[in-house]
Swiss-Prot record:
Native species: Yersinia pestis
NCBIfam families found in the cross-reference section: dsbE (TIGR00385)
Disulfide bonds: 85-88
GO biological process: cytochrome complex assembly
Known function: Involved in disulfide bond formation. Catalyzes a late, reductive step in the assembly of periplasmic c-type cytochromes, probably the reduction of disulfide bonds of the apocytochrome c to allow covalent linkage with the heme. Possible subunit of a heme lyase.
Subcellular location per the Swiss-Prot or TrEMBL entry: Cell inner membrane
A GO term, aspect molecular function: disulfide oxidoreductase activity
Stretches assigned to the Thioredoxin domain: 44-186
Keywords: Cell inner membrane, Cell membrane, Cytochrome c-type biogenesis, Disulfide bond, Membrane, Redox-active center, Transmembrane, Transmembrane helix
Periplasmic side: 31-188
Pfam families xrefs: Redoxin
Transmembrane segments: 10-30
GO cellular component: outer membrane-bounded periplasmic space; plasma membrane
Name of this protein: Thiol:disulfide interchange protein DsbE
Amino acid sequence: MKPQSSFNKLMFIPLVLFLLLVVAFLIQLTRNANGEDPTMLESALIGKPVPAFKLESLEQPGKTFDQAVLRDGKPILLNVWATWCPTCRAEHEYLNKLAAQGIRVVGLNYKDDRSKAVQWLNSLGNPYFLSLYDGDGMLGLDLGVYGAPETFLIDGQGVIRYRHAGDLNDRVWQQEILPLYKKYQGGA
């Protein structure tokens, strides 16, 4: 009797998992129908300092930086990117445009091949005033990165003020990030 009872319990597990997936799917459909932006990720880090880190420069192995580089009194965009990310390539031209306008962008090269990343920047242009190399993805993990690209607005004191998942484009910049950027630029 016991083996049959254990078998019945095991057969019940896939049904429960399936029902949980259906519920999660329906919740997301409802959110999308209500106009919620699926790229707007809630983050427990909003309003908190950037997690402590010590990372090498992408272009200069051995030269390290820590979170203090993001606390210089001026707002910064922290852009998580990788050469394996097709959406990163799509947003790269816009990042170059922002950099040309004087917007300070720090690149966080995420789980990537360093030499490919340097070559990529050399061929497509480098919008980053600083490129950090997160080869093992630990800072990305600490930031709660789901994938690339993601962009964080960091105020002049190193506090995360906004997070955007997906490509940074003109609509996102103008409607979501620029007003906050100006707010924290004015407070510098």
